Design a protein with these regions (language model features):
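Active-site histidine-anchored catalytic micro-motif
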Residues: 1-222
């Protein structure tokens, strides 16, 4: 089995199991985080469809991301997770998916949901099987330790790295994911930094505008 080694351990997040566990602890307990540690709700009915989580270093956005994972833990236990992230490196295809193997972090090794990944790839002509786009990309990798911390390493996932993010491409990818996971207990995580170097007022204004468009399913305005 192919195992992707972490490229950001010791950079975007702590590089050892003990130090990373403590770092994620502090993200959840931080004043900008939920203020307590997550406890997965085994009886949760799973109503959350998707999360939007930042992908900066944990020292910058970890507590904000922790709010999303705390809500997800309270909501229940998903069976699989589709993680979508932007391509910062310029490597690989315009939309790249991995359909086999596993990813390693200091917290352990999580397997790719091969069945779901293949279904997604088969539903779209624009999604390519391409490992090179993922090799040095951080946007998806930084989500994985939060999932492993919350649910352990048994939760499988599907990584999709997007260099092309125009409306047509995004709609096609979204439809492929929707068709592939329809009727399943899956969560979608959109890895996105909504703000860089702006004050709270400006960031909140932009955030609320985007949230309104997401809730209204208005992809063109978004």
């Amino acid at each position: 089995m192919k195992v992707r080694s972490p490229c950001q351990a010791g950079a975007f997040y702590a590089g050892t199991k003990s130090s990373l566990t403590k770092q994620i602890d502090s993200c959840f307990l931080h004043k900008l985080g939920p203020g307590k540690l997550p406890a997965p709700n085994k009886k949760g009915k799973r109503s959350i469809v998707a999360l939007v989580c930042p992908h900066a270093g944990y020292m910058y956005s970890g507590p904000v991301a922790a709010n999303s994972y705390f809500a997800l833990a309270k909501d229940g236990i998903p069976e699989t997770c589709v993680i979508m992230g932007p391509n910062h490196t310029g490597m690989g295809s315009g939309v790249s998916i991995m359909i086999e193997g596993a990813w390693e972090t200091p917290l352990g090794t999580s397997s790719i949901d091969a069945e779901t990944a293949k279904k997604i790839q088969e539903q779209s002509k624009i999604i390519d099987v391409d490992e090179s786009a993922h090799r040095l990309e951080h946007s998806i990798e930084v989500q994985l330790p939060f999932l492993q911390y919350t649910y352990g390493t048994n939760l499988k996932f599907v990584p999709i790295c997007m260099m092309m993010q125009d409306l047509t491409t995004s709609c096609e990818v979204g439809e492929a994911i929707s068709n592939a996971i329809s009727g399943s207990n899956a969560i979608i995580i959109a890895s996105s930094d909504m703000t860089h170097y702006e004050n709270q007022a400006a960031a909140s204004k932009k955030d609320m505008s985007v949230i309104e468009q997401i809730l209204g399913l208005d992809e063109e305005s978004l």
